[in-house]
């Protein structure tokens, strides 16, 4: 890789992109407005960080709800087991739990983000605390840099890794979608995912967690989802891994 990329976003995807590029011997700049990298990563899995899943490529694809084949090339090159090897090489011992879910042995998401940040520093990735505003291109459409709120950063390639719109408090504000649209990319309508469900009559059961239970979701009388796992009652309905995967 001869191009010197700038990565926009210091979450899990941005840090991984910067590490992979830097390991190929190129100078990398990473832009992140938050004071700490991996802010959303640190709260995943109830603070434990569900790193990946220990299933093979075909099984992973079979469990993607929509258009799983789109991920075939990526998973073929770097699947869940490759992810496990990557983190264990960075000094994060892992364990496999029910459902083949993979967590750090310490049960601390911070250990995962800290390992990524250490690797960034070892590879001398330039970390810049700034919020990207837009990707700069010339009259031919070639990338020339990134305009930030504080400065402008020349770049021969840009990786948009800003996250979605799921948690504004962590920096996932949808800015990456806006920048992608400015570059001519098509942004499809976004809908919620990994969310709890509202249900009547659950308030009295708030806090009760059940394991090894079945869940079936109906829409207009038609069954649209069924699975088996762990469920948590809340004051407004149900949550937990079983529900969030629905």
Residue ranges and their predicted role:
Residues 3-30:
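N-terminal Rossmann-like FAD-binding beta1-loop-alpha1 element of flavoenzymes
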Residues 24-26, 90, 123, 183:
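Conserved dinucleotide-binding and phosphotransfer motif residues
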